[in-house]
């Protein structure tokens, strides 16, 4: 085991001893500044870990001016099952509690002991993996309260300090897993190169008309507000050689309509009327496209005298059956029957 000096142009190196081995899972360091826990450093992956200011050579960087580039090494002894701390000839020294370690001499670090590097105020406490309680309660032991009983059943520690310690450990463990996953993924995945967008400016020779109503007078200014609706029209009847148009068939029907002759319906028209307007058959004339009847100026007179019918001034009385009960009864009013179209005749209820 040897360590190069931190001074000079040569790079500091650390030779791993033969007795170094992999530590048990869950071994970690609590980084505390004052009374506040800053983070947890998991140290169960490698045989040794380097501490110092140089982030390229050290596993854990100490950001303090009093620390050397490669300050110290933390090594796990595979036979003794203990952790040893080695000072790599640092300028301001490595401390176990308040005792400064000798350079290049391994010093055993007990569990729950605290170490510090240089003049840094951060203290590093060695911890094992937090122990969880069994899920079942042994014997007749009873928990004090409902919360403590629930924590015991879930396998969580009863005290708040132990619970916070377990939470911080799990957080640090998850961060390490996510970091390792990202680093391994970056080795296999090649990031595609970004294509630069064409930043050149081009001009189009074609003129683009935005408002056509300003150029074309046939385009209305409010064309966007106009709505067009198409209403289908019934097809007109096709006029064939054997069929008549609507207007002609209508006039034919009006001509064939039987008009009453009136007082002078049978006389022919005079010469002035015949020359001024056309007339049709049956004593009708076409006025405004419609047939109108002519008045009969000389109707036929019936010369046979009309004999009036004889009127009987003394009608014979109609015999009726005498009913003595009807005489004593009071007279009843008789109302007229109501009649309307479609009413069926019903027998009268009045006597």
UniProtKB/Swiss-Prot annotation:
Residues 330-351 are annotated as: RNA-binding. Changing residue 264 to D: Abolishes in vitro phosphorylation of isoform gamma by Lyn. A motif (Nuclear localization signal 1) lies at residues 185-209. Residues 143-224, 310-329 are annotated as: Interaction with EED. The modification Phosphoserine is found at residues 178, 199, 204, 249. Its cofactor is Mg(2+). It is found in: Nucleus; Nucleus speckle. One of its GO terms (biological process) is RNA splicing. A motif (Nuclear localization signal 2) lies at residues 210-240. Its EC number is 3.1.4.-. Residues 1-142 are annotated as: Interaction with CDC5L, SF3B1 and MELK. Its main location: nucleus. Residues 191-200, 331-337 are annotated as: Involved in PP-1 inhibition. Signal peptide: none annotated. Residues 49-101 form the FHA domain. Residues 316-351 are annotated as: Disordered. GO terms for cellular component: cytoplasm; nuclear speck; nucleoplasm; nucleus; spliceosomal complex. Keywords: Cytoplasm, DNA-binding, Endonuclease, Hydrolase, Magnesium, mRNA processing, mRNA splicing, Nuclease, Nucleus, Phosphoprotein, Protein phosphatase inhibitor, Repeat, Repressor, RNA-binding, Spliceosome, Transcription, Transcription regulation. Residues 200-203 are annotated as: Involved in PP-1 binding. Changing residue 348 to D: No effect on the ability of isoform Gamma to inhibit PP-1. Has a basic N- and C-terminal and an acidic central domain. The FHA domain mediates interactions with threonine-phosphorylated MELK. Interacts with phosphorylated CDC5L, SF3B1 and MELK. Interacts with EED, in a nucleic acid-stimulated manner. Part of a complex consisting of PPP1R8, EED, HDAC2 and PP-1. Part of the spliceosome. Interacts with PPP1CA, PPP1CB and PPP1CC. Inhibitor subunit of the major nuclear protein phosphatase-1 (PP-1). It has RNA-binding activity but does not cleave RNA and may target PP-1 to RNA-associated substrates. May also be involved in pre-mRNA splicing. Binds DNA and might act as a transcriptional repressor. Seems to be required for cell proliferation. Isoform Gamma is a site-specific single-strand endoribonuclease that cleaves single strand RNA 3' to purines and pyrimidines in A+U-rich regions. It generates 5'-phosphate termini at the site of cleavage. This isoform does not inhibit PP-1. May be implicated in mRNA splicing. This is Nuclear inhibitor of protein phosphatase 1. It comes from Homo sapiens. The gene is PPP1R8.
